[in-house]
Amino acid sequence: MSVAGLKKQFHKATQKVSEKVGGAEGTKLDDDFKEMERKVDVTSRAVMEIMTKTIEYLQPNPASRAKLSMINTMSKIRGQEKGPGYPQAEALLAEAMLKFGRELGDDCNFGPALGEVGEAMRELSEVKDSLDMEVKQNFIDPLQNLHDKDLREIQHHLKKLEGRRLDFDYKKKRQGKIPDEELRQALEKFDESKEIAESSMFNLLEMDIEQVSQLSALVQAQLEYHKQAVQILQQVTVRLEERIRQASSQPRREYQPKPRMSLEFATGDGTQPNGGLSHTGTPKPAGVQMDQPCCRALYDFEPENEGELGFKEGDIITLTNQIDENWYEGMLHGQSGFFPINYVEILVALPH
């Protein structure tokens, strides 16, 4: 920075201190300007918070959002294509239903019904993915562009205006000690910056119908999603009702117990007829077979942040994901969340 530039910065700082500490009066901007500045500030804050809340609405699981963001960042660093999308809850439910529907098979009512509903859930997850992309393209991205371009440019003009106001007020206070031409130039620069800032704010506020169009795109995307979701659910409802009707019309089978086998005791000479026991009964199961990843809580854990899963010592928690070296994601009593690894012991490990 040149000597003249350093000198000007010193003058601005001096004027700012005299206003804040000494109570000096600076040049006041008119009420219309202040009102536009207020509305622009509210617009800027609204855009940032609404973008954040919209993403949370579309992708409600904070752990999944964090993992997805990390994967996409690493893919970008490595020059790879964009990583997988957000794991929709409907897709996870569909996967479980389809899996157990296949295991149960077609010789019962529940298995095929699980398959039908699982397929409907898979279709819902695809429609949800389309909603995510539509909202990002037609709502979030335009708001991001508004924030990064127009609002940032206005903030630049306002900052420049404030600097020139301080410079003008400093020189005005020293009128008679500095050349009149220098004061006149400072006033011209201040007026020029005020006009540029005022014009940019006016144009933004005057064209706010663009933001209304973006809101309309958000609502229309949701409307289309719900229309398709209703259609999918209506179709699977018809199939389930038909399955119920057919099952109700079939004669109910009666349980037919198999003949019991007799227990034969040893004879007096210590031998057992026919080689011993002819009936061993039903073997007692050795214990509960845990066929899915799970862990046991070693201590109580009270959640302190949104998205964390609380539990009590001894609770058995179903594991769904490992976020990083310190956190697991799991489910307990129908609630999903993440929790510290060192609070639990693994019973069935997650697949690698």
Curated annotation (Swiss-Prot):
Segments for region (Membrane-binding amphipathic helix): 1-21
Gene source species: Rattus norvegicus
Segments for region (Required for dimerization upon membrane association): 60-87
Residues modified to Phosphoserine: S262
Modification Phosphotyrosine, positions: Y299
Name of this protein: Endophilin-A1
Subunit comment: Monomer; in cytoplasm. Homodimer; when associated with membranes. Interacts with OPHN1. Interacts with SYNJ1. Interacts with DNM1. Interacts with MAP4K3; the interaction appears to regulate MAP4K3-mediated JNK activation. Interacts with PDCD6IP. Interacts with ATXN2. Interacts with ADAM9 and ADAM15 cytoplasmic tails. Interacts with BIN2. Interacts with TMEM108. Interacts with ADGRB2.
Domain SH3: start-end pairs: 290-349
